[in-house]
Amino acid sequence: MTSRYRSSEAHQGLASFSPRRRTVVKAAAATAVLAGPLAAALPARATTGTPAFLHGVASGDPLPDGVLLWTRVTPTADATPGSGLGPDTEVGWTVATDKAFTNVVAKGSTTATAASDHTVKADIRGLAPATDHWFRFSAGGTDSPAGRARTAPAADAAVAGLRFGVVSCANWEAGYFAAYRHLAARGDLDAWLHLGDYIYEYGAGEYGTRGTSVRSHAPAHEILTLADYRVRHGRYKTDPDLQALHAAAPVVAIWDDHEIANDTWSGGAENHTEGVEGAWAARQAAAKQAYFEWMPVRPAIAGTTYRRLRFGKLADLSLLDLRSFRAQQVSLGDGDVDDPDRTLTGRAQLDWLKAGLKSSDTTWRLVGNSVMIAPFAIGSLSAELLKPLAKLLGLPQEGLAVNTDQWDGYTDDRRELLAHLRSNAIRNTVFLTGDIHMAWANDVPVNAGTYPLSASAATEFVVTSVTSDNLDDLVKVPEGTVSALASPVIRAANRHVHWVDTDRHGYGVLDITAERAQMDYYVLSDRTQAGATASWSRSYRTRSGTQRVERTYDPE
C-alpha cells in the first residue's frame, strides 16, 4: 500500500557479560540490491584534484516549506574523514520537483572545509508542502547521486495518512544493514526515524556478533577524539544500504548513548575512564560535533537533539535527548530510582515536553524516545504489598527494574509526565522507542502494579535492533529460542506488555490515520548476510482515544 501522500512518480520505483555490553540485554537474560531510481552506483574513489561524493547524500527534519540537505565531498584522495586535510571546496546544490531536474525550484552553493570535515549542510526553504523534491550536489564538475526528500504537510492541512520507517541500534561489525535496504525499496515513506545508536563507539572485535565480527570498524580502536568520531561516521556512511535509505527519504534522528559511549549520562559514561581515555567533557563535545557534522539534524538548541516537528493536523513528533541532562544510572534494586532529585530528561526538557503535549492540536502526539518508558520489572507483587515492602527495604516503588538506564531508573520523571497526560486528558500519545534490541508493544500504565484494572496514559512501540546483539546472540542459541521462553515470563510480570520478541533483528513501519496508529514489525532472515530478506512478523495498533495497544493482522 502506498502512502496517501506519495506521488505516482515517487511510487515507481543470563550470564556474566563484559561491562562494555549494553545493560538492557545482558540484564534481561556488502552485496546489496538497491531500489529503483535510488540504485546509483557508489562513485569511484577520489583522485587528486577530482572531487567525489563517496558518502552519499541525505536529507532530514522535513518542514512544510523546507528540508535540511547533507553530503560530504572528498576534494582530494588524502582528504579522508578525520584527516583534517583537503582544500576548501565550493559545493553547489540543486533542488527540483522531478528526478530529471527539469523543474528546478532552488539552487545555491556553499564552501566545504576541513574544519567541518568537508561535510555540507544546506537548510532549504521556500519549498511546497507535502511534495516530493529531488536534490543533488556538485563540485568541480562532479555530480553527487540524487536523493529524494518529501516536505511535511502544511501545519493546518487535513492529512489522510502518514508512514514512517522506524529503526535503531545498527552495529557495523555485527552485520549488514539490510533493514535499511528494505525500507529504501518501499518507496512510500514520508520519512524515517532513527531512534539512536546510529553508530557504535567500540574498538574492533569488542562488540560483534556472537563473539565474531562480520566486518571491521574504522578506526580499529575505541573512538575517543574528534578525528576518531569523524572516521567512524565516515565508515558507516560508505554502507550502500544506508546510503540508499538516506537517498530515499528524509531522516528524523536522535542520539542515544553509543553515538558517544555506552550508558552515557550528563557527567560521564559506563564506557569511559576519566583520565585514561581523556576528559569526558572533551570526548562528549567531540562526539556531538561529529554527529552534527555528519547527520542531517537541525538542532533547536545547540548541543542537543530535542526538538519538535509537525505533520499537518494529523501528528506532531516530539524528539527527546535522554543523555545530555540525565543523572548517573543507579544499580539494580537501588531505591534511588525513585529519588525526585534524579532526572532523565532535565527540568527544561521535561517542561518543554509537557507543554508541547498539552498545547498540541493534532490527532496524534508522537514522542521519539531513545529508551523504553513502559515499566519492565521482575518479582512483581500486588500493589498493597509492594509499596510498604519497598519503603521498608529501600527498594524501587514500582518493582525491581531490570534496566535502570531507561525510564525505570528515573521514576519521578515518568510519574510526573504520566500524571500530566492524565490530569490534562491528553490522548493519543505514542512513544516510539529503540535501544533495547527487542521488539515490544506496550501500554504505558499509570500504575503497573494494578494494571489492567487501572488506567493507561499512553502507548509505546519499541523496535528491535538493525544488527546489534539481542538475547539469542548473547547466549548463542538458535533465533527464537530465548523469546519462546522469556516472552511469557515477561508478560506475566508486566501485564501492560502485549508482545515482546527478544531475539530477532529488523525494523518497523509506522502507519498513521485519524483512526489509529499502527506499527508493522519486520524481521531479517540473517543479519550476517548482505542480501538478507525481510518478512512481516506482527502488527499492533492503538485506536484513537483508547490509550491501549491491540494486535491486528493487516500490515499496511
Swiss-Prot record:
Cofactor(s) demanded: Fe cation; Fe(2+); Mn(2+); Zn(2+)
Leading EC class: hydrolase
Pfam families: PhoD, PhoD_N
PTM field: In late stationary phase, is proteolytically cleaved to a more active form where the two parts of the molecule (phospholipase D catalytic chain and phospholipase D regulatory chain) are still tightly associated. Predicted to be exported by the Tat system. The position of the signal peptide cleavage has been experimentally proven.
Domain of life: Bacteria
Cofactor note text: Binds 1 iron ion. Iron is essential for catalysis. Binds metal ions, iron, manganese or zinc. The ion could be involved in the binding of substrate and/or the release of the product.
One of the record's GO molecular function terms: phospholipase D activity
InterPro entries, per the entry: Metallo-depent_PP-like (IPR029052), PhoD-like_MPP (IPR018946), PhoD-like_sf (IPR038607), PhoD_N (IPR032093), Phospholipid_Metab_Enz (IPR052900), TAT_signal (IPR006311)
Source species of the chain: Streptomyces chromofuscus
Functional pH dependence: Optimum pH is 7.5-8.0.
Compartments (UniProt record): Secreted
Family affiliation: Belongs to the PhoD family.
Name used for this protein in its record: Phospholipase D
Consequence of changing H272A: Strong decrease in activity
Catalysed reactions listed for this entry: a 1,2-diacyl-sn-glycero-3-phosphocholine + H2O = a 1,2-diacyl-sn-glycero-3-phosphate + choline + H(+)
Free-text comment about domains: The N-terminal region contains the catalytic domain and the C-terminal region contains regulatory elements.
Impact when changing Y200F: Almost complete loss of activity and strongly reduced content of iron, but little change in secondary structure
Resulting phenotype, D197A: Almost complete loss of activity and strongly reduced content of iron, but little change in secondary structure
Keywords on record: Allosteric enzyme, Hydrolase, Lipid degradation, Lipid metabolism, Secreted, Signal
Signal peptide as annotated in the record: 1-46
Keyword Signal: yes
GO term, biological process aspect, one: lipid catabolic process
Subunit structure: Full-length phospholipase D is a monomer in solution. Proteolytically cleaved PLD is a heterodimer composed of one phospholipase D catalytic chain and one phospholipase D regulatory chain.
Chief localisation class: secreted
